[in-house]
């Protein structure tokens, strides 16, 4: 490893940032023209507001930061304007396919994000498990689909989970503008719907990464397997598995017991399933391999990985199809991760490491969405407003990612946060000059390179 880096950004490149955003958004403007008017201008102003906001934002602060913009027009654009968000999301998927799509190394990821809310008037709000807070709380739950190819990541689809009591509440449905054709769907069903839509939209991917809540659901794993798609699913440490497939069948009626003959298939011969955490302790040293996962900002991440063929216990207590169990423990941590995958028999450890490590990038995508694009910063309570806000957030994330990729050719350690900070300076009139922001970005690059180099020398 040499102490060198690529950095050839100049002031002219900074001026091109705004031109690039203008060009990218011009390709979406037709999606913001309704039967009665065009809201393309407001759509770009909303994007600008997100790019300019330095903290938690809202439409009032967006209107203050964006020239010739007012709060009411943005409020109407998000909450009331009838533009259709579905075609925008489809276009986003096409752009993701065009710029970072790869049928071998690309991956789509299923995960959710919770948004704590006060009161009971925001669409879909309910006291339910809130992952963000780690407890039951009053919140909305969004189910999302993300995409990554290596470190390049973004969200590409969304759904709002509506609890069953919302579906049956005509008064609240009407107040929040929930369409009549919206019926109850579980979060897992929403995830499957998004996966199929991405596939139908020709989004290329080599595998599907699945969060633990969704990964433990045998129905979803089976659906993916039947469609000949590959998954790697996080699962809890107490999920049951068999190393040998037990014999199943319909047991005979017990002698002397009245009633109907049994009709449900059950495990009739074999041991009880064991928990995956118990299997970990039974593995010998020869079953573990030390494998590179990915680069981090300071060092390379390596893990001890074991792969075992197992039969997972399904929701009905029967064994599922044989698949891989991946047990992974990263260096310098006590945390152990468990994953199931239907990858082919000949799958290499390197491939498993890449698939397993890719789950990290969907977590980063949510951090990007909340930290630089205002994913959780909204006050709208309506069905339309929620979907409009999420769609515009995903669009802003796409723009930032694409500019990071483009400018990264001249600054190899450029991050999405760097790009966001550049926008905060060059879009409004600022006291800091372009030369000064360029110098700040260069200093960040040098710090990142120095951190990597120092860690490399310590671990030689």
Which role does the model predict for each range below?
Residues 151-180, 236, 241-361, 424, ...:
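An anionic, glycine-rich sequence signature occurring as long contiguous blocks
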Residues 55, 70, 331-336, 343-348, ...:
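Short acidic (Asp/Glu) and glycine-rich catalytic loops that position anionic groups and cofactors
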Residues 401-429:
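Conserved nucleotidyltransferase catalytic core and NTase-mimicking acidic/glycine-rich helix/loop elements
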Residues 2-209, 213-240, 247, 254-277, ...:
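Conserved, well-structured functional cores that handle cations and Mg-NTP chemistry
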Residues 50-54, 66, 78-81, 343, ...:
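Generic structural signal for hydrophobic core residues of well-folded globular domains
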Residues 32-33, 341, 347-356, 371-387, ...:
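Short, solvent-exposed helix-loop connector elements
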Residues 363, 395:
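Hydrophobic, well-ordered secondary-structure elements that form the walls
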């Amino acid at each position: 490893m040499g102490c060198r880096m690529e950095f050839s950004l100049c002031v002219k490149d900074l001026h091109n940032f705004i031109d690039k955003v203008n060009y990218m958004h011009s390709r979406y403007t037709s999606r913001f023209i309704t039967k009665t008017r065009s809201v393309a201008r407001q759509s770009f102003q909303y994007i600008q507001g997100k790019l300019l906001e330095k903290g938690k934002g809202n439409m009032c602060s967006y209107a203050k930061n964006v020239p010739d913009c007012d709060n009411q027009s943005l409020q109407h654009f998000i909450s009331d304007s009838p533009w259709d968000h579905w075609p925008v999301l489809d276009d986003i998927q096409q752009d993701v396919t065009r710029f970072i799509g790869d049928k071998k190394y690309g991956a789509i990821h299923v995960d959710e994000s919770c948004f704590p809310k006060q009161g009971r008037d925001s669409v879909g709000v309910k006291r339910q498990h809130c992952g963000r807070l780690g407890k039951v709380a009053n919140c909305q739950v969004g189910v999302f689909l993300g995409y990554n190819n290596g470190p390049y990541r973004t969200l590409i689809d969304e759904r709002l989970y509506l609890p069953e009591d919302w579906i049956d509440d005509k008064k609240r449905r009407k107040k929040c503008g929930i369409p009549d054709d919206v019926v109850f769907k579980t979060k897992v069903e929403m995830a499957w719907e998004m996966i199929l839509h991405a596939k139908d939209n020709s989004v290329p991917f080599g595998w599907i990464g699945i969060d633990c809540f969704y990964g433990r659901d045998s129905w979803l794993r089976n659906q993916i397997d039947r469609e000949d798609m590959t998954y790697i699913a996080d699962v809890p440490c107490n999920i049951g598995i068999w190393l040998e497939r037990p014999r199943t069948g319909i047991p005979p009626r017990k002698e002397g017991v009245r009633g109907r003959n049994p009709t449900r298939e059950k495990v009739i011969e074999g041991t009880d399933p064991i928990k995956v955490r118990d299997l970990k302790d039974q593995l010998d040293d020869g079953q573990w391999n030390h494998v590179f996962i990915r680069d981090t900002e300071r060092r390379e991440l390596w893990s001890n990985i074991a792969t075992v063929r197992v039969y997972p216990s399904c929701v009905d207590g029967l064994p599922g199809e044989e698949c891989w169990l991946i047990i992974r423990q990263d260096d310098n941590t006590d945390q152990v991760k468990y994953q199931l995958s239907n990858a082919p028999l000949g799958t290499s450890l390197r491939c498993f490491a890449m698939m397993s490590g890719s789950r990290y990038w969907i977590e980063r995508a949510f951090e990007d969405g909340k930290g630089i694009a205002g994913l959780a910063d909204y006050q709208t309570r309506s069905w339309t407003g929620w979907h409009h806000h999420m769609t515009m957030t995903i669009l802003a994330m796409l723009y930032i990612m694409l500019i990071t990729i483009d400018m990264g050719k001249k600054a190899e350690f450029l991050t999405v946060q760097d790009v966001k900070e550049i926008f905060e300076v060059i879009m409004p009139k600022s006291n800091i000059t372009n030369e000064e922001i360029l110098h700040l970005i260069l200093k960040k690059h040098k710090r990142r390179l120095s951190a990597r180099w120092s860690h490399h020398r310590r671990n030689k």
